[in-house]
Design a protein with these regions (language model features):
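Residue-level marker for buried hydrophobic side chains located in beta-strands
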Residues: 18, 67-69, 129, 266, ...
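Active-site microenvironment of metallo-dependent hydrolases
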Residues: 1-35, 39-40, 49-50, 90-92, ...
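Short, ordered loop/turn segments at secondary-structure junctions
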Residues: 101-104, 132-133, 169, 199-200, ...
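Divalent-metal coordination cores built from histidine and acidic residues
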Residues: 5-8, 83-194, 257-259, 494-498
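Histidine/acidic residue-rich metal-binding segments in metalloenzymes
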Residues: 112, 146-166, 172-238, 245-266, ...
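Short, small-residue-enriched loops and turns at beta-alpha junctions
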Residues: 76-77, 104-107, 135-142, 170-174, ...
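Divalent metal-coordination and catalytic microenvironments
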Residues: 22, 42, 61, 72, ...
Length: 567
């Protein structure tokens, strides 16, 4: 193979594909120059003046850019299967992605990770998995699986496994949890990258966290936080997703202070499928950076070579001889609309059309198994008249919540007025019968219920409603379809979106899935869900007991400031 690549490089043999008359974006020297790109055997054989090839494509001055890299994402957050998610990424020029499948791991453990590896691994892009490090995320809820260091040892050498996923257990790292240290030791001994997750961790605690072997962080929300992490030796992944949008705040500081960008890269973390379809992922980050005043070639560094170097990906991320022929052709560097996308010298978009999605095994399609329940499970009789109860107060446009209270004797009238709603989390993995029951305000639903099996991070069944009867209907509908979203009016099901894989993802085509998501959300808003509240996504975060101030899990109402359950 290399003999032929050398012959093409020397001009003695025709290339497989010749990209003629292009402008090469060189992220190694931050320059742009006119050249042809000769591709042979899946790699770039030469960049310069070439004439011979099996296929010649005249670019007419278009820009040849290294394939873009998404340094950190969660495929499951799109609710699309890996094949359909990857196809959307490729449409916008991403040829390498690094995913942390901790959502499906919390439901199905190693079986879920194997599915993600198989499904994504057949796609025409570089698809890497960082093994989830925190399954479950906390001890305050029941997940479908528990993964310790011994489980990770069994997976670490699987094809496609790159490093360790985000280490969310910051106290466990800083204060030397034995189990956390075993995980860190495993990946450090193999020379693998360890992703961090350190929101608002500063000072000496940050130093201890980084000194333990953490390599990256994607949780900075300000330039000052990002700068401190850079000074402590972390690679900072600049996040621009659907809910968490931190790029502008960080890059304004980078541009204003003129700092070196070698340890900066772009990622999305969580991004909705409709947003990806509309604007892409990393391409959107590059466009935003350029609009903020960053030079286009420098912005593209944060989307290509920087990511590759941070994660140790050899010969990926630049347009140079001997490097993998992962390339994107753009007409211009303003609109950044891909004209062609190549992976290992193959037209990646055409290659996508030939791929059939993997059929998940039966265990991944039958994961909603709560113990028996009825309307009585959600009844007002669980609340005593003479007691004060905490109420989760939702905030429009935020996943943070506030705390309020209500006397038990006032709950029935508040429900009738729509001032509060009932909320419950049913353990759905092992049939334990655990049910957390509580109260919530600020959602706005009228006469019915909403339920979902997407409930971060353990993904139990969460339901909110105006009556126990409506909640019972909604929860039973999700058991019937084995996971997804559902909306009930009165006690009749209005609409259901099945998420047939672990209650997290749909095997429906992307366009169909986007339409279904938009439709059920619109119906929920028409039924009273307030503006600024996503009927399902906002609800899914009410079960995550690591975000202030008040949450609910299958074990009960949880005060995240005191880090304890409310008895």
């Amino acid at each position: 193979m290399m003999d032929r690549v050398r012959a093409v490089a020397l001009g003695n043999s025709p290339a497989d594909i010749l990209l003629k008359n292009g402008r090469v974006v060189d992220v190694l020297t931050e320059t742009i120059y006119e050249a042809d790109v000769a591709i042979a055997e899946g790699v770039i054989a030469g960049v310069g003046s070439y004439d011979k090839a099996e296929k010649i494509i005249d670019l007419k001055g278009a820009y040849v850019v290294p394939g873009l890299i998404n340094a950190h994402c969660h495929v499951e957050s799109s609710m699309a299967v890996p094949e359909h998610y990857c196809a959307e990424e490729l449409r916008w020029g991403v040829t390498t992605l690094i995913t942390d499948p901790h959502e499906i791991a919390n439901v199905a453990g190693a079986a879920g990770i194997h599915y993600m590896l198989e499904a994504g691994g057949q796609m025409p892009l570089n698809y890497y998995v960082n093994l989830p490090s925190c399954v479950p995320a906390t001890r305050f809820e029941h997940s479908g699986c528990v993964m310790d260091a011994r489980d990770m040892i069994k997976l670490v050498n699987e094809p496609g496994v790159l490093g360790m996923g985000e280490m969310m257990n910051v106290p466990g790292v800083i204060y030397n949890s034995a189990e956390v240290q075993k995980k860190l030791d495993l990946f450090q001994s193999l020379g693998r990258v360890i992703d961090g997750h350190a929101p608002c961790v500063r000072g000496k605690e940050l130093a201890a966290y980084v000194a333990s072997g953490i390599d990256t962080d994607h949780e900075s929300i300000s330039w000052e936080e990002a700068k401190e992490k850079l000074r402590n030796g972390l690679a900072v992944l600049v996040r621009e997703g659907s809910a968490s949008r931190n790029l502008t705040a960080i890059l304004r500081g980078v541009i204003d202070e003129g700092v070196d960008v070698s340890s900066l890269a772009f990622c999305t973390d969580d991004k909705h499928l409709a947003d990806i379809r509309r604007e892409g992922t990393i391409r959107h980050c590059v466009q935003m950076a350029i609009e903020l005043g960053m030079e286009p070639v420098r912005a593209l560094r944060l989307a290509t070579i920087n990511d590759a170097r941070i994660y140790g990906l050899r010969r990926v991320g630049a347009v140079a001889p001997g490097w993998q022929a992962d390339l994107v052709v753009f007409d211009n560097l303003q609109s950044l609309t891909p004209q062609a996308v190549f992976h290992k010298g193959v037209d990646a978009l055409k290659a996508c059309e030939k791929i059939t999605p993997v059929t998940p095994n039966a265990s991944l399609q039958g994961s909603v198994k709560p113990a028996a329940f009825s309307a009585d499970t959600f009844a007002l009789s669980h609340f005593a008249d003479d007691r004060e109860y905490p109420v989760i107060t939702m905030l429009p446009g935020e996943i943070f919540t506030e705390k309020s209270t209500i006397m038990g004797k006032d709950i029935a009238s508040a429900l009738e007025k729509g001032d509060v709603h009932l909320i419950a989390v049913l353990e759905r993995h092992h049939g334990t019968g655990n049910v957390g029951l509580g109260l919530l305000r600020g959602y706005g639903l009228k006469d019915g219920a909403v339920a979902t099996t997407v409930a971060h991070d353990s993904h139990n069944l969460i339901v909110i409603g105006t009556s126990p009867e409506a909640m019972n209907v909604a929860a039973k509908e999700l058991v019937r379809v084995q996971g997804g979203y559902t909306l009930v009016k009165g006690t009749e099901v209005v609409d259901t979106l099945p998420l047939n894989i672990c209650g997290l993802m749909s095997s429906a085509p992307a366009e169909e899935l986007i339409g279904s998501l938009d439709e059920i959300a619109a119906k929920a808003h028409a039924q009273g869900v307030l503006d600024g509240i996503d009927p399902f996504i906002s609800l899914s975060f009410m079960a995550l007991p690591v975000i202030p101030k008040l949450r609910i899990t299958d074990m009960g109402m949880f005060d995240t400031e005191k880090f304890e359950f409310i008895k």
